[in-house]
Amino acid sequence: MRTAKDIIELLLELEHGIADDLEDQDLDFKQWDAQSRDKAVKTLVQMAVCMANGGGGTVVLGVADRVQGRANAILGVPPEIDINLLKKAVYDQTDPKITPVFEDLSVPEGTGRLILMRIYP
């Protein structure tokens, strides 16, 4: 499982590459859909299911996965998004129930906030 420190180190690589190239079976980067909170939550639930089916992993919310340059790729997650509500949404919309662990990660780019969602096997 990736730690916040691991993610911070990986984000440095965005200066010379794209997040999609950093992804693997247990790591995914997703842009937060700022236009539709419902769509963003639906995507989050889908990612939780994918990670659970794949044996667990970490999803980094707030990073465009096909954009080069750290400042361009890190868009962030709006500060009003409540991680407790995200956790409840994933739990309520999955069967069997998935209980993700969320963590805020401060960054200087975008909204200044990324969210890490960890799914344990």
Show the residue positions of the predicted features.
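Conserved N-terminal catalytic/coupling substructures associated with nucleotide/phosphate chemistry
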Residues: 1-121
